[in-house]
Curated annotation (Swiss-Prot):
<comment type="function">
    <text>Involved in the biosynthesis of phosphatidyl-myo-inositol mannosides (PIM) which are early precursors in the biosynthesis of lipomannans (LM) and lipoarabinomannans (LAM). Catalyzes the addition of a mannosyl residue from GDP-D-mannose (GDP-Man) to the position 2 of the carrier lipid phosphatidyl-myo-inositol (PI) to generate a phosphatidyl-myo-inositol bearing an alpha-1,2-linked mannose residue (PIM1).</text>
</comment>
<dbReference type="GO" id="GO:0009247">
    <property type="term" value="P:glycolipid biosynthetic process"/>
</dbReference>
<feature type="binding site">
    <location>
        <position position="196"/>
    </location>
    <ligand>
        <name>GDP-alpha-D-mannose</name>
    </ligand>
</feature>
<feature type="binding site">
    <location>
        <position position="282"/>
    </location>
    <ligand>
        <name>GDP-alpha-D-mannose</name>
    </ligand>
</feature>
<keyword id="KW-0444">Lipid biosynthesis</keyword>
<keyword id="KW-0460">Magnesium</keyword>
<feature type="binding site">
    <location>
        <position position="9"/>
    </location>
    <ligand>
        <name>GDP-alpha-D-mannose</name>
    </ligand>
</feature>
<dbReference type="Pfam" id="PF13439">
    <property type="entry name" value="Glyco_transf_4"/>
</dbReference>
<keyword id="KW-1003">Cell membrane</keyword>
<keyword id="KW-0594">Phospholipid biosynthesis</keyword>
<keyword id="KW-0328">Glycosyltransferase</keyword>
<feature type="binding site">
    <location>
        <begin position="274"/>
        <end position="278"/>
    </location>
    <ligand>
        <name>GDP-alpha-D-mannose</name>
    </ligand>
</feature>
<keyword id="KW-0808">Transferase</keyword>
<feature type="binding site">
    <location>
        <position position="16"/>
    </location>
    <ligand>
        <name>GDP-alpha-D-mannose</name>
    </ligand>
</feature>
<comment type="subunit">
    <text>Monomer.</text>
</comment>
<feature type="site" description="Important for catalytic activity">
    <location>
        <position position="118"/>
    </location>
</feature>
<feature type="binding site">
    <location>
        <position position="68"/>
    </location>
    <ligand>
        <name>a 1,2-diacyl-sn-glycero-3-phospho-(1D-myo-inositol)</name>
    </ligand>
</feature>
Length: 374
């Protein structure tokens, strides 16, 4: 099967959707499918041979963050040319509501179209502005996928259409067997934060407020930070706590897995804006117990607290208590690790890719190819 995938977000920087698209493409290619990917990317970015760059992206506020998207008249011709050259049996669009490549492709493409909805934002400027235009375009989508129940419910409420729920995937074996960072695990214990730490919704300020409470019981605890952000600003914000912080910066998938394998606890202090919780799944696959905010998306991944510790979002005192409880209790951590290992099986790419493939096969039953509207 010839499969065309479109990612709206730039490959210049790592992100959940970008990673999902690349990993799905790799799994499908390993299964013998012919896959091509179109995504924004700068000329100096190294891309797999099956990825075609649609050109540079620009920062645009979207879904409570700043996403690097591509939305200009020049994109129209690039998308059309890629679709014609691809001769695809199925076109798989990711985030067709984002003002970028997927939206352009949905405008011009016809035939076997699949779309995955990753976000569950309840307030979308893009949707409010383009809703009248988007609805008829969305009628072209034959197979709809939502990565979570939240994303599915949002799609039903905002667009009046339903979707099959298929979660994001992870490579469980790769994460569980990753090597640890040199010098880890530490005797003084390590708490891992992963994400863009200067985005308020990621909750770094809550974690910093909780850290002194953790230090009362573990005076040599280290906060290991992986991700992008203004390091100097965070150092200033942390004050005297900075001696207990190690910045790894932006790392590749192997570095992320190593960091997860090296931590005693993974902490997700997010305060909102999450539709899934892929990093929680990755941490559990790596064998690291999780403490996370009690957001709907995280609660579903952690099975209402059965496979990870949930705390009220924004409550630094509760977060400190939860971190201390796990760091001082080896038996509790081991219980969460064992429960997490069982829970992540449904997220392994061997399962997720098969579910997505069934959607492809369903929409392609007519035998018609993806066409470009005249």
């Amino acid at each position: 099967m010839r499969i065309g995938m479109i990612c709206p977000y730039s490959f210049d920087v790592p992100g959940g959707v970008q990673s999902h698209v690349l990993q799905l493409a790799e799994v499908m290619r390993a299964r013998g499918q012919q896959v091509r990917v179109l995504a924004p990317a700068s000329p100096d970015v190294s891309l797999p041979e099956y990825v075609v760059s649609a050109g540079r992206a620009i920062p645009i506020p979207y879904n409570g963050s700043v996403a690097r998207l591509q939305f200009s008249p020049a994109v129209h011709s690039r998308v059309r040319r890629w679709l014609v050259d691809g001769d695809f049996d199925v076109l798989h669009l990711h985030e067709p509501n984002a003002p970028s490549l997927s939206m352009w492709a949905l405008r011009v493409a016809e035939g076997p179209i699949v779309a995955t909805f990753h976000t569950s934002t309840t307030k979308s400027l893009t949707l409010s502005v383009f809703q009248g235009v988007l609805r008829p375009w969305h009628e072209k989508i034959i197979g709809r996928i939502a990565v979570s129940d939240l994303a599915r419910r949002w799609q039903m409420e905002a667009l009046g259409s339903d979707a099959v729920e298929i979660p994001n995937g992870v490579n469980v074996d790769s994460l569980s067997s990753a090597p640890q960072l040199a010098g880890y695990p530490r005797l003084g214990k390590t708490v891992l934060f992963l994400g863009r730490y200067d985005e308020p919704r990621k909750g770094m300020s809550v974690l910093l407020d909780a850290l002194p409470g953790v230090m009362e019981c573990f005076d040599d605890v280290q906060l290991l930070i992986v991700g992008r952000g203004d390091e100097e600003q965070l150092r200033s914000q942390a004050g005297g706590l900075v001696e207990h912080i190690r910045f790894l910066g932006q790392v590749d998938d192997a570095g992320k897995a190593a960091a997860m394998r090296s931590a005693d606890v993974y902490c997700a202090p997010n305060i909102g804006g999450e539709s899934f919780g892929i990093v929680l799944v990755e941490a559990m696959a790596a064998g690291t117990p999780v403490v996370a905010s009690d957001l709907d998306a995280f609660r579903r991944v952690l099975r209402d607290g059965e496979v990870g510790h949930l705390v009220p979002a924004g409550d630094s005192a509760a977060l400190a208590d939860a971190l201390v409880a796990l760091l001082r209790n080896d038996v509790l951590r081991e219980r969460y690790v064992a429960a997490g290992a069982e829970a992540v099986r449904r997220y392994d790419w061997s399962v997720v890719a098969s579910q997505i493939m069934r959607v492809y096969e369903t929409v392609a039953t007519s035998g018609s190819k993806v066409q470009v509207a005249s």
